[in-house]
Amino acid sequence: MFKMLNPRRFYHAVGKKKFLEFILLAVFILFFYGPLLNMLMVAFANEYNVPSVLPQEWGFKWWGYVFGQKSLVSSMIQSFIIAIATTVISMIFCIPAAYSLARFQYPGRKVFMLSFLLTNAFPKLGIYTSIAVLFYKYGLMGTYAGVIIIHMINSMMFMVWLPSSAFRNVHRQQEEAARDAGASPVRTFFKVTLPMAMPGIAVATLYTFLGSMEEAQGTMLVGLARIQTMPVAMYGIVLDSSAIQIGAVFAILLIIPSALLIFVMRKYIGPEAIAGGFKMK
């Protein structure tokens, strides 16, 4: 076994092609998982002085510090409330629009679809600043409504394009078969079309929820100091301290709900559901 650890012996044992594949895989794993492992290490380090490879002392000192902040619990609650509200409202407005774009042909349809890409085509800070000026005029600054609208603007591309692709992939013959069996258009939609399009809708919902949970710039600008979500609270606490462990602890706290949601919805998440959403027909 230990002889196989010799690089030269390993190279001759597996061959040149397999050896190169192993090296590329090792580099990829190091590149992908290295920062995550470093973050975990730093989060549980009571004392850590760069450039030391390992912490000088392990423990939960900085976890206690973070959970001792009064703003943490309220910011977590606000993050979940805003993310859920953003996801639900986006579905109410965007799913019908996605179905319309998938099933009907009308003048300006492609231009309308491309318009949903504009929010991701320009620097977000510039868009947020322009929207903030408009919100100030209508009294939406520092309100939940203003923050939710900002979060919805970021999610509209996913909530329209991905479900639209999912609806296009539902064959009309299946809907017509349900209609021939006596189902009404509404019943056909909820019993046939919607369940078959659910993988694409689930992926869009996931992107919307996670995007809302992680949105910081728009929340800080529109929410002012009144609305503190987790990313906003993280910025404030991290800037008040020079300890890098605080940032690592907050990063883990932000990752946990995202990882749990991805695990729950894993059966709906596939490359075809994601890639298919960015094809215009």
Model-derived regions: residue spans:
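N-terminal signal-anchor/first transmembrane alpha helix
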Residues: 1-39, 255
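Transmembrane alpha-helix signature in integral membrane proteins
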Residues: 44, 70-100, 185
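Transmembrane-helix boundary motif in ABC transporter permease subunits
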Residues: 3-16, 84-116, 189, 267
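Short membrane-interfacial helix/loop motifs at transmembrane-helix boundaries
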Residues: 2, 34-70, 223-225, 272-281
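Interhelical loop and adjacent transmembrane-helix boundary motif
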Residues: 11-18, 60-70, 212-273, 281
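Non-cytoplasmic
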Residues: 42, 47-50, 125, 129, ...
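Membrane-interfacial helix termini and adjacent extracytoplasmic/periplasmic loops
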Residues: 50-54, 60-61, 109-110, 122-155, ...
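Membrane-cytosol interface at the C-terminal ends of specific transmembrane alpha-helices
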Residues: 99, 144-180, 187-193, 204-208
